[in-house]
Amino acid sequence: MPDYMQEIERISEFLRKVLQGKNAVIGISGGIDSSVTLALLTRSIPKERIIPVFMPDRNTQQADYDDVQKLTQKLGLTYREVRIDPMVDSFVSTLAATDRAAIGNIKSRTRMIILYYFANTNGGMVVGTTNRTELLLGYFTKYGDGGCDVEPIEHLYKRDVYELAKILDIPESIMKKKPTAGLWAGQTDEDEIGMSYAQMDEILSDVFDKGTYNDKPEYKKIMEMHSLSDHKRNLPYSLKK
């Protein structure tokens, strides 16, 4: 069993080293990953150097507003709120966009633009919130939530993030919430992928940590997602000199 207290200290030291006195800009949603990452930041650098940004849209649930407020108050932080609807609507209107997934990616990339605005104007670095499960599945938007300067929990499976959340005393309402990327109304990660995070973590750990694999349909699905998203985990294709 991993030593999660030691892992918290390791991540905190990593963040201090990488940020090197710069401000930390982080997008928060009221979800488990951004909540844990925000709490880790408070253990790493002075609170006045942390800039949390909440970027809701018309599909954002009231529970998310409540959880963002609850968490930031608990951590002694002040957050910025920027609604993304006007910007996203402008893109959708200009492009006559109708594809739900493409519009979801526009939302994610709009949030990235906002975070980099605050980083540019506050001498900061953008802190990402992608976990290892999402990384291996490619379950993130290229140049969207995948666009950042440092990824402090990218080596942790979703199950590990929950273990850290317990130690960091993340509010129970956040712990119990169904994970969602919030890209369209009613979307949840597990429904979209078609299996629980516990199943995903077990399969990914079997394949990438233990080197074991079988021909069960769920293994094939996970490996197909990994293969199709390979481009997200690599630099753009280019010719060698």
UniProtKB/Swiss-Prot annotation:
Pathway: Cofactor biosynthesis; NAD(+) biosynthesis; NAD(+) from deamido-NAD(+) (ammonia route): step 1/1. Disulfide bonds: none annotated. Pfam families: NAD_synthase. Deamido-NAD(+) binds at residues 109, 142, 149, 231-232. Catalyzes the ATP-dependent amidation of deamido-NAD to form NAD. Uses ammonia as a nitrogen source. Belongs to the NAD synthetase family. This is NH(3)-dependent NAD(+) synthetase. It comes from Thermoplasma acidophilum (strain ATCC 25905 / DSM 1728 / JCM 9062 / NBRC 15155 / AMRC-C165). The lineage of its organism: Archaea, Methanobacteriati, Thermoplasmatota, Thermoplasmata, Thermoplasmatales.
